[in-house]
Amino acid sequence: MNYAYPDEKGHYGIYGGRYVPETLMQSVLELEEAYKEAMQDEAFQKELNHYLKTYVGRETPLYFAENMTKYCGGAKIYLKREDLNHTGAHKINNTIGQALLAVRMGKKKVVAETGAGQHGVATATVCALLGLECVIFMGEEDVRRQKLNVFRMELLGAKVESVAAGSGTLKDAVNEALRYWVSHVHDTHYIMGSVLGPHPFPQIVRDFQSVIGNETKKQYEALEGKLPEAVVACIGGGSNAMGMFYPFVHDEEVALYGVEAAGKGVHTEKHAATLTKGSVGVLHGSMMYLLQNEEGQIQEAHSISAGLDYPGVGPEHSLLKDIGRVSYHSITDDEALEAFQLLTKKEGIIPALESSHAVAYALKLAPKMKKDEGLVICLSGRGDKDVESIKRYMEEV
């Protein structure tokens, strides 16, 4: 399969690109240049690997979920344990890389957006480590849902700005963070949290997250002497999935499954299933599939999981859907909750609600596969942050 994206203009087929105001163009070009240089620099790679190993705690285990496998009665189920990273999710793979890039570019300050708070915490964490000033924008609805993470960020020295505009969720936080970056661009780096935004962000985030798929490949081959037959990951903006899928894109014998949030159901207004129900448009500097109405107004996305309710999806996922290399599915709030409880009870591992969507789809897929086949789930984060809202949800039900 001939797959080499993005092109030199930052396009993935028709998707991606740089739809930014003139005031930002210079900055994204400067970032692209700095990133290319860093990727060629052995000292930078060495420093990044040092922090990934000794600070983040990589490599993360590839765990054979024996009880889940028996329960499903089909393929062997493996979990790639990104929940065991420092700060409890895959987000730090990217923030540590981008923060080192910010230092390299001589920036003193970092701005970021956050939904569930995981990216915010991971950003505040690396800023504390590297002595960078940190400003985090978070929708007020998410601030309410994720009080603990807000407190964590503040403990780490970050300034958390609550965003009341729009629906008060991730999309609005990205808007404000981009605005802030425009006016502080001389001394500030924007750490985009997912494979979104203008080029080179989707590529940078994908490359820093690819450590997930690269490790998985190596670990699975060591255990089974072959590649897995299937790989499953959840998708909001799509960074854990892109990090898991990208190293497998050329291995066409490996089926790749992306799992979006169907919320209350894709037949309702309350979902975040962009690739299932969306259409093409431009948001936050990039062309991608979006949830929008006939007039092109962005619709509100809904999911029980704060990390999946983004109304768009990374441009590379948009392309991978069109060319059929990844098949995209969606899982409802209720199915995700069921999977959350099942994994907790069967394996003693409490997954994030985001990751529970991937687990839920794997539970449907595994029984249809043969016993000598393997299925890897990217367990993108731990569920500590969700226990409170799940308790509330279950009491209401």
From Swiss-Prot:
GO terms for molecular function: tryptophan synthase activity. It comes from the Bacteria. Keywords: Amino-acid biosynthesis, Aromatic amino acid biosynthesis, Lyase, Pyridoxal phosphate, Tryptophan biosynthesis. InterPro entries: Trp_synth_b_CS, Trp_synth_beta, Trp_synth_beta/beta-like, TrpB-like_PALP, TrpB-like_PALP_sf. Pfam families: PALP. Its EC number is 4.2.1.20. Pathway: Amino-acid biosynthesis; L-tryptophan biosynthesis; L-tryptophan from chorismate: step 5/5. The modification N6-(pyridoxal phosphate)lysine is found at K91. GO terms for cellular component: cytoplasm. The keyword Nucleotide-binding does not apply. It catalyses: (1S,2R)-1-C-(indol-3-yl)glycerol 3-phosphate + L-serine = D-glyceraldehyde 3-phosphate + L-tryptophan + H2O. It is an enzyme of class 4 (lyase). Its cofactor is pyridoxal 5'-phosphate. Belongs to the TrpB family. The beta subunit is responsible for the synthesis of L-tryptophan from indole and L-serine. Tetramer of two alpha and two beta chains. PANTHER family: TRYPTOPHAN SYNTHASE, TRYPTOPHAN SYNTHASE-RELATED. This is Tryptophan synthase beta chain. The lineage of its organism: Bacteria, Bacillati, Bacillota, Bacilli, Bacillales.
